[in-house]
Amino acid sequence: MSTGLRFTLEVDGLPPDAFAVVSFHLTQSLSSLFSLDLSLVSQQFLSLEFAQVLDKMAYLTVWQGDDVQRRVKGVVTWFELGENDKNQMLYSMKVCPPLWRTGLRQNFRIFQNEDIESILATILKENGVTEWSPLFSEPHPSREFCVQYGETDYDFLCRMAAEEGIFFYEEHAQKSTDQSLVLCDTVRYLPESFEIPWNPNTRTEVSTLCISQFRYSAQIRPSSVVTKDYTFKRPGWAGRFDQEGQYQDYQRTQYEVYDYPGRFKGAHGQNFARWQMDGWRNNAEVARGTSRSPEIWPGRRIALTGHPQANLNREWQVVASDLHGEQPQAVPGRRGSGTTLDNHFAVIPADRTWRPQPLLKPLVDGPQSAVVTGPAGEEIFCDEHGRVRVKFNWDRYNPSNQDSSCWIRVAQAWAGTGFGNLAIPRVGQEVIVDFLNGDPDQPIIMGRTYHHENRTPGSLPGTKTQMTIRSKTYKGSGFNELKFDDATGKEQVYIHAQKNMNTEVLNNRTTDVINNHAETIGNNQMIAVTNNQIQTVGVNQIETVGSNQIIKVGSVQVETIGLVRALTVGVAYQTTVGGIMNTSVALMQSSQIGLHKSLRVGLGYDVKVGNNVTFTVGKTKKDDTGQTAIYSAGEHLELCCGKARLVLTKDGQIFLNGTKIHLQGKEQVNGDSLLINWNCAASKSPPKTPDEKQDTPDMREY
């Protein structure tokens, strides 16, 4: 049976007695990796290969006789070969917890819609840390987009835990080699406290549980935290939370920490502010003590008793310890004062939760390029805010699909309430991504760029004078385009509409073409003018209609022709007037009809001629009157046919002249007169017409 204080070390793969412990130094504190430095001696192994020790599990045990006082388990992270006198070999070793491995991996990585427990579980699992426990009492909502940006897994874990008000420590089983990592967000989840009496006698045995020195101190720390943030989904939201520190009667309250951005988008920001405040004041009141007991380590609570200063006899939370053991007699031939153990520790009052101070978040150095992503077969993938998803060039985990990143806002040339510029980056396009305040969790697309596979419109440098806005038909090969060409002497504005083009002008529109204007319409054209239309042609106008033309005038149509109008109709011409039609010709009107002219008048027909009327009929003229026909002349009425004439004059004379005159009455011929002269040379020749009397060129001879 062993007696007294002693230390042993075992390493996986080596015999239990391979090393004797000369001394060790175990440094521990909340939310940090413990470090166990050992000086060892071995008579059994005068030489060891590094592969036999490094990355192996090592177990330090503190004994009091045959009773285990403390066990510590960890990974051998450093090993040194020391002096060798051919009888024994001195070694030095550093042991760290399995969590230490997380400090060797640096990564760029995206976590989406995961809470802190899920994120930490992934990190720990990938680093082989399987023995761990989350003890959470506070709400820790999922994060939409959380980026590990160039940090080691350990730095990322520590930063995230600090943001969420979580501290961690190694929980050591006293009677076995079990040991686990504990992540906790409240002091209430720590093991129940155990009493330790005050005993200033420094010569007590390790087996005597007591504290020999205990000093309580306070210092001025930040007094309040104000944290603020912004979310575009609630632009009018104040986004501010204030948190006053507790237990600060001994200091002023002017030491405010203002944090922007606060990395929150809702009411959860109040917890962030409170956790920050606890972190900034985690060392405002600290007691430091000394004991020979190895049972005091971070993650435990103790209750001090028997101290002459009564207010110190209370529960305390252990936040750090520095355990140092000496066993010089382990080296054969070396003398010493025997095995010793000292524990210097730090505690804070147990009525408050110790939390880590906020850690700096890595900042993105500048803009980055990324590629817009979406579901297979989709060309445009966005949400109701015009946000898109991208695949970052450094992302090794997410596929290039609709889940490659969070929704990312896109900067536009102009953004107003219901107005501005909008151009959604399309799947496959390369974009330039910046980060608000350099925060990798807040990407924003600031621009787009071409690359070797996504070429520009046109063919550079040949089209270098062109400024082009060209779209692409959704799931097609067409495009709409607005192009400005500034080539000297060939300046041009070009507009291309793949299908429809609509122009809406709420007031006036003016088009001024200095030279020529040509319009070609492949199918139909419709122009609707609500009020008036004025069309002015300076010289000539030619209008060609290939088939039919219909002109409808609702009321009045006035047509004024300065000189000549010619109308040519190939087949038929019809004019229909619903009411009255007046035709006024200042000088002459001529009508030429190739075949036939028909005139139908429903009721009356009046013709008034200021001077002469001439009818020339090539063959036959027929007048047919249904009832009465009256021929009236003011001075002279004449019928002529060859050498036959019938003349009526206004003085009542009737002249009948011809080579032969035949009078036949089938029943009778009647004649009455006061005087009848027959064959006595009494008859007169018919008089001339008034025009013939004036020797006009139209006078006839009979």
Positions of predicted regions on the chain:
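Polar/acidic, low-complexity leader/linker segments enriched in S/T/G and N/D
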Residues: 1-19, 209-211, 365-371
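Short alpha-helix capping/helix-loop boundary micro-motifs
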Residues: 37-48, 281-292, 414-420
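Surface-exposed cap/loop segments at beta↔alpha junctions
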Residues: 48-133, 137, 142-146, 171, ...
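Short, well-ordered loop/turn sites that connect or cap secondary structure elements
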Residues: 52-53, 296, 312, 425
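Extended, domain-scale alpha-helical bundle/helix-rich regions
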Residues: 85, 114-131, 138, 146-350
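Glycine-rich, acidic and aromatic/proline-enriched surface loops and short helix-turn segments
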Residues: 96-98, 113-135, 258-271, 375-403, ...
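Structural signature for extended repeat/solenoid scaffolds and their inter-repeat hinge/linker regions
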Residues: 175, 180-186, 365-657, 662-664
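Acidic, low-complexity/disordered segments
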Residues: 309-370, 446-452, 456-467, 684-687, ...
